Amino acid sequence: MARVTPIVRYRNIGISAHIDAGKTTTTERILFYTGVNHKIGEVHTGSATMDWMEQEQERGITITSAATTCFWSGMANQFDSHRINIIDTPGHVDFTIEVERSMRILDGVVMVYCAVGGVQPQSETVWRQANKYKVPRIAFINKMDRVGADYLRVVEQLKTRLFANPVPIQLAVGSEDKFTGIIDLIKMKAIHWNELDQGVTFSYSEIPDNLTDLSGIWRKHLIESAVEVSEELMDKYLSNSDQLTEQEIKQALRQRVLSNEIVLVTCGSAFKNKGVQAMLDAVVEYLPSPSDVTSITGVLKDGSTRVNRHANDHEPFSALAFKIATDPFVGNLTFFRVYSGVVSSGDSVLNPIKEKRERFGRIVQMHANKREEIKSVHAGDIAAAIGLKDVDTGDTLCAPSSPIILERMEFPEPVISVMVEAKTKSDQEKMGFALNRLAQEDPSFRVWIDKDSGQTIIAGMGELHLEILVERMRREFNVEANVGKPQVAYRETIRTSVKQEGKFIRQSGGRGQFGHVWLRIEPMPAREEGYKFLNEIVGGAVPKEYIPAVDKGVREQISNGILAGYPIVDVCVTIFDGSYHEVDSSEIAFKIAGSIAFKEGFMKAHPVLLEPIMNVEIETPEDYMGDVIADLNRRRGIISGLENSTISGKIICAQVPLSEMFGYATGLRSQTQGRASYSMEFLKYNEVPNSIAQIIINSRQIKQ
């Protein structure tokens, strides 16, 4: 089936922001103005199209990345129809994984900020994720109608807190209840939207007298940012600034956005139906099409030969599976982004990571949780497949005749765990299936059975994350479960290097067992580098066929923990010597020898416990600041900054161990009479102080 929309008129964008910036409301307005919805959905009434899960409608937050497609021809129908594939992503830090995997497959992002709250901690997390994947972006400063709205203050925060290079292409006409429209700094006209038809029509007018000077200043800033794109344009501007055409300015700005040199800033009030329409125009004019993005690079099966795929229908098919979702009617839905080529329903493709062929049963275009079946998808498309049996998030799908492995996604390790227990025997049978399904959908969610207690443990990115997954288990799989208290995901590591011998010799008549190794056990130079095993055997002291067995013995100790039963991280283990017996040596003997050497060496290398440290940001009236800081100090917090709040009060930034943050919301509420709020996100792992570590180790040993 031939392509309907040329690839240059595609825009694959994300709508991303911190919680409560009005992101889903913005997306709902996009769906209304592009004709997908004929009625505006609202978050506060639970009718938002993109928040389709029951929990999302009840809580008023976005949990999963919903996908939809719409078409836009411009506010004044000035463009050919552009196809916009939108991923609406969560703002809550517990669902950062959804943002991460969306950024991996998008070409551009609209960052939504609240004109009152400004740049929040979660804004910084999302910004870092966009930086990681070099995604071009524009900013939409929303909620200009709210009390305390200040457009230019948020523009300044983009510079100071995100180290961005913001270039406003609009100014606000008024703010709070006097917000009436925007000033287009390229056309140098004011735009007002018709409230009678919910902003479908608009009119231009002259810039109000009180904003003429300010508009001139920011227009100059915009032009100077644009002409930096080339010496030729700079010379033209310097010789006569009035010579620059609107088209030249827009092309120059677009070029700098695509190079991630500037961030264009727009504004409005999605709730009041103002500004979203002009922001959509900016998406078309300034964000990249798939063909603007450099080719995607992958490797062949050998892992070293690099190959490129271009956004072209004539190249071999390649795609990345970025999300697995469970649909009650069709089973697994595999969301994928096509980077090159074409695939049709019924086609066979290769999963080169698992070396398995998969068949596309049906291909569907998703609109939130509604499906529209389509025959084929082309380079640049985002769609979902039904019928893929063994595909995980981050797997590559490609033409069997031209294998390629695209760069895999990285997922954060969980920082919090709880015990779950089925309420009845019938629930017990269903619970394993439900948890495995949820873990398949969400790579930041882990499930395992505790080897000592036999209990089922689930782990995730925060209390809300686990709470919602348990709730989904109840609603979607009809499983009732009791949930234990949250537990911190501690880790174990070492401070110093040691050399340790490990011997396993057994003679009991007949063939014996013999394994003998020397290991060097060293701490990694940086935190969160995991585990590395190196082989420095020379002269065949240990035959090479036994080396993997030694690694396996070490890995078992690493996953089980030694000090207190927590996983071991940030260690490098090198086998550098040993011996073997021609008859009695075996894989199992060397596995046990490796395990013995590592366990004994680990305890000599000054082992320590690590705990997750959270970045905490509290907004509180100034009257309560002393109490809040004193409480943070009691919780082993380190104050990292104080800022003036956007309204009246202070923002306190602190680094606090996760173990001290359980129940913090209740404590903060009582301290400040409900007038303070806080947010937190995982920052790093740090050593647990000796006195506290000993209590944790002793309690674990008693349990074991």
From Swiss-Prot:
Main localization of the protein described in the UniProt heading: cytoplasm
GO function terms (MF aspect): GTP binding; GTPase activity; guanosine tetraphosphate binding; translation elongation factor activity
Keywords (A to Z) from UniProt: Cytoplasm, Elongation factor, GTP-binding, Nucleotide-binding, Protein biosynthesis
Top-rank lineage group of the source organism: Bacteria
Sequence positions that bind GTP: 17-24, 88-92, 142-145
Keyword Lyase found: no
GO biological process, any: ribosome disassembly
Cited SUPFAM superfamilies: EF-G C-terminal domain-like, P-loop containing nucleoside triphosphate hydrolases, Ribosomal protein S5 domain 2-like, Translation proteins
Keyword GTP-binding: yes
Residue ranges of domain tr-type G in the record: 8-291
GO cellular component: cytoplasm
InterPro entries referenced in this protein's UniProt entry, alphabetically: EFG_II, EFG_III, EFG_III/V, EFG_IV, EFG_V, EFG_V-like, EFTu-like_2, G_TR_CS
Entry's localization field: Cytoplasm
Function text: Catalyzes the GTP-dependent ribosomal translocation step during translation elongation. During this step, the ribosome changes from the pre-translocational (PRE) to the post-translocational (POST) state as the newly formed A-site-bound peptidyl-tRNA and P-site-bound deacylated tRNA move to the P and E sites, respectively. Catalyzes the coordinated movement of the two tRNA molecules, the mRNA and conformational changes in the ribosome.
Annotated family: Belongs to the TRAFAC class translation factor GTPase superfamily. Classic translation factor GTPase family. EF-G/EF-2 subfamily.
Protein name: Elongation factor G
